[in-house]
């Protein structure tokens, strides 16, 4: 009889060693003296309020606690960020799923579609066509045209979420609680210096003049990469006002979904997938990014989506996967060249992993799409 093989304990040992070293560092450097206890109290109070708001849905609608928490956080977002920004962002997200599903179907269509929209509109910024009616009609037309693909993607996302919650309800609840706490930064008005001095310029110009003045004499950063600000501009024009909070909440959702999928592609069970989401949401930098318009929040969504694409086919590849990866890589370059540099090892990893099934004929088209999205 063949000998039974046991998984190596080294990966788990490395993971738990990192946690142990973190605890040792906290004690050795007396980090509790630097902890912002008033902020921790505020977060604890918000968590209790969210659980209380979710309780009626659990009690009378028999929703899972994680799903009820998600609904409570979304309702709070609509209250504090405004219903119009949330509706505008939802319309943009639906249109992104519609166009992204032309490349790959399923929830992955959302980050791909956002990359396609940003890459396309980036070439049209100087034209006076960025009116609210134009954006609304374009999004509604895409939603009407691709409604079946959009509904399929939403069903797939819900089934994945529901299955994950049923498999590990406690971990799912913890992850949704932390993700919701991170999203509270999206309730705040835009007030970080970089955002007020630069990032708000593009969305505000699109809303006020229907075009973007790419003139470095007016703003020294006017010709800097702008993919993230373009999507902020679409949401702001559709909403008729600032929509940063709702758009950042969308990026948090995309990042959480990508991290959940990536952890699964790496072999994690349901609990570890939710742990990956919780880890991402609990990083202090995540909340800081959700309060502003920095490119790192967008990269936090697109990079794990690209990594998931590399892993998804278990050693095989397809032309559509190559095109999807090219779109995401180009979008990262158009976000900030640094993010493209960070993604380069993933491209090398993808080439090695899929070397036996690499669709060479799709590579020139992929390179062209990456140049369009990142140019």
List the predicted regions and their residue ranges.
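Membrane-embedded, hydrophobic transmembrane alpha-helices
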Residues: 1-162
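Transmembrane-helix signature of polytopic, membrane-embedded enzymes
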Residues: 65, 69, 106-112, 242-243, ...
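Membrane-interface transmembrane helices that cradle and orient dolichyl/undecaprenyl
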Residues: 104, 306-322, 350
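Transmembrane-embedded, aromatic-rich helix segments that form part
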Residues: 134-138, 323-324, 337-352
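Short hydrophobic alpha-helices at membrane interfaces in multi-pass membrane enzymes
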Residues: 276, 312-330, 360-364
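Short acidic/glycine- and proline-prone juxtamembrane loop motifs at membrane-interface regions
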Residues: 288-298
